[in-house]
Design a protein with these regions (language model features):
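Alpha-helical transmembrane segments in multi-pass membrane proteins
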Residues: 6-62, 83, 87, 111-112, ...
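Central hydrophobic cores of alpha-helical transmembrane segments
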Residues: 13, 146-153, 196-206
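Functionally important transmembrane alpha-helices
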Residues: 22, 170-226
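Juxtamembrane helix-loop-helix connectors linking adjacent transmembrane helices
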Residues: 32-46, 58-126, 133-134, 138
Length: 259
């Protein structure tokens, strides 16, 4: 690592990422409620700003030298069964995709949705459960690092109000995001890598936007989101228990071993 992880760096990454997304979205002038309703609105209102955010995160991770701790656990959770929460999330996402009337999408719209999934999956995970979690682990015990990084991930969705989203529905979105963020954290701990969480996050968002735009009928699967959130919160203790992923202590141990 070029730069020793510090907690304040996590807050700087969080604020910088959020500010970038809001600024670019405001500049392109696409209200949040329009995202997911057309190829142009989805590209300008989501793919473009989040893509720029992804580029900045790549630059930041490279400058800090944090790619390894951001993407990989030193030791994954010995308890595998909590993966049931993200597995249910995968099933719900697939049901959403099957429940979507894909005839309503042209090629440009499909490409925009794919771009949305790729950039959201990478950017939001790299920011919250990558760089921010790495920074928080340098100072906090694992339980607090999970809690604070997940809270910030949930609160980040309040920015949608500034972009035109209704406040009442956004509050619910914040709560669900905290729970789904916990599911992504559980997946990281169980698999030992952030990559699976990136893939699931992208798949989830694409499925929600797709079925929201062109449902074949009543969408029941998305209603399971609060259950997934609650289940994730119920099992997260078991992937936190006994965990020490402090990047500073591990770096010091490696240095002493090499000497």
């Amino acid at each position: 690592m070029r730069v020793t992880p510090r907690m304040w760096i996590g807050f700087v990454v969080f604020v910088g990422y959020c500010a970038t997304i809001v600024l670019i979205t405001k500049l392109v002038g696409v209200p949040y409620p329009e995202i997911g309703k057309s190829a142009e609105a989805t590209f300008k209102g989501a793919v473009l700003p989040i893509g720029v955010g992804a580029l900045l995160l790549v630059i930041t991770a490279t400058a800090l030298g944090w790619w390894r701790p951001a993407l990989f656990e030193r030791r994954r959770s010995p308890r595998r069964w909590p993966i049931v929460a993200p597995v249910i999330m995968v099933v719900v996402a697939l049901v959403n995709l099957v429940s979507t009337d894909w005839s309503q999408f042209d090629a440009a719209f499909l490409l925009s949705l794919v771009g949305l999934g790729v950039f959201v999956g990478f950017s939001e995970e790299m920011m919250s459960r990558g760089l921010v979690l790495t920074a928080f682990r340098s100072r906090l015990r694992e339980g607090w690092a999970w809690l604070l990084s997940s809270l910030l991930f949930g609160l980040m969705h309040l920015l949608n109000v500034a972009l035109g989203a209704p406040f009442s529905s956004t509050i619910a979105q914040v709560a669900i995001a905290f729970g789904s963020g916990t599911a992504f954290y559980v997946l990281r701990r169980v698999t030992g890598s952030l990559i699976a969480a990136m893939v699931l996050h992208g798949l989830w968002d694409v499925s929600v936007f797709a079925v929201g735009f062109a449902p074949k009928g009543t969408v029941f699967a998305t209603l399971v989101a609060p259950v997934i959130a609650a289940l994730s919160l119920a099992v997260v203790y078991w992937v936190i228990k006994g965990t020490n992923e402090n990047p500073i202590s591990h770096a010091s141990t490696s240095a002493h071993a090499a000497a």
